[in-house]
């Protein structure tokens, strides 16, 4: 609790130094994520403070400028930029994260509309940011080799569940093939999951998408894998809808394999904390994916 208060006071001081006329009546730490601290101010603004030096907020601003006014869903409009420290601030997009319980409560029609909204966002994003813009934006690919390295070192030979280990190794082979494949490359949004969307519970539609910090040049299969660990049915429906409107060919098996490897890598990351929630969640997600009878 004291750590959170200390962080909040630090962020408040940084903002007041840069914007002395900006009145901060309330401030709350929403999330301490993998790459950013996310703070809500006055119940109206969201401020993101990067944890790492390699978070390129200028690149995000360029991408959002390209998308502004040309995309169906709401996206962040940056109003505050850090002057001495790195951060951005924008008006909060109305909506809520999509929880598993919330998704389960939706009707079949609402689930289809949700999948359509996600697919349409990706279609518009890829259309407005074709691969030809990669050089202009100085975009590269993520480092995908760390996942196999972590799995080889901390998962293979240490996981006692032989059937689960075989499942991981089969998908690891597919993943290693995928990251060598230089065909069907796109500029990927690269972070589509339940916590980066503003969901309208009343209409069962998406209001907006945020966090554009992971945009990179990737094989198209990598664009969809994060949804698989959340809900395989939703992921499959998004892929189907995307294929329909874009005409692109996407292998559900390749997306699935990437999801398996990504989750298995988390077992490696938290291998020394087998009783932690993150380790147990990763293990349960893998068992859930392994239990699927069919894809697509």
PLM regions: where:
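ATP-binding pocket architecture of kinase catalytic cores
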Residues: 25-142
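Active-site acidic catalytic loop and adjacent metal/ATP-binding pocket
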Residues: 37-40, 47, 173-222
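Glycine-rich, phosphate-binding/catalytic loops in enzymes
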Residues: 64, 106-107, 204, 225-227
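A general structural signal marking secondary-structure boundaries and capping sites
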Residues: 19, 68-71, 96, 125-133, ...
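Helix-rich C-terminal or lid/interface subdomains of diverse kinases
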Residues: 113-117, 217-296
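Short, surface-exposed alpha-helical segments at coil->helix boundaries
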Residues: 8-12, 61, 236-239
């Amino acid at each position: 609790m004291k750590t959170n208060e200390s962080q909040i006071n630090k962020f408040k001081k940084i903002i007041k130094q840069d914007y002395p006329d900006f009145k901060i009546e309330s401030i709350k730490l929403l999330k301490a994520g993998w790459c950013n601290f996310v703070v809500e101010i006055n119940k109206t603004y969201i401020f993101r403070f990067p944890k790492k030096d390699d978070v390129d907020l200028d690149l995000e601003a360029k991408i959002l400028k390209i998308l502004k006014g040309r995309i169906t869903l709401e996206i962040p409009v940056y109003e505050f930029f850090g002057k001495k420290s790195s951060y951005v601030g924008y008006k909060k997009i109305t909506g809520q994260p999509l929880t598993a319980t919330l998704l389960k409560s939706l009707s079949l029609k609402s689930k289809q509309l949700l999948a359509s909204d996600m697919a349409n966002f990706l279609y518009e994003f890829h259309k407005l940011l074709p691969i030809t813009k990669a050089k202009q934006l100085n975009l590269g690919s993520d480092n995908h080799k760390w996942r196999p390295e972590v799995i080889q070192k901390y998962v293979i030979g240490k996981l006692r569940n032989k059937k689960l280990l075989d499942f991981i190794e089969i998908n690891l082979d597919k993943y290693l093939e995928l990251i060598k494949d230089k065909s069907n490359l796109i500029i990927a949004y690269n972070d589509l999951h339940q916590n980066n969307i503003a969901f309208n519970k009343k209409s069962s539609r998406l209001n907006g998408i945020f966090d554009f910090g992971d945009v990179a040049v990737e094989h198209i299969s990598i664009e969809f894998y994060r949804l698989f660990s959340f809900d395989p049915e939703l992921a499959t429906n998004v892929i189907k809808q995307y294929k329909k409107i874009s005409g692109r060919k996407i292998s559900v098996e390749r997306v699935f394999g990437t999801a398996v490897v990504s989750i298995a890598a988390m077992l490696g990351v938290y291998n020394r904390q087998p009783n932690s929630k993150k380790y147990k969640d990763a293990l349960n997600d893998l068992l859930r994916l392994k239990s699927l009878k069919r894809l697509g």
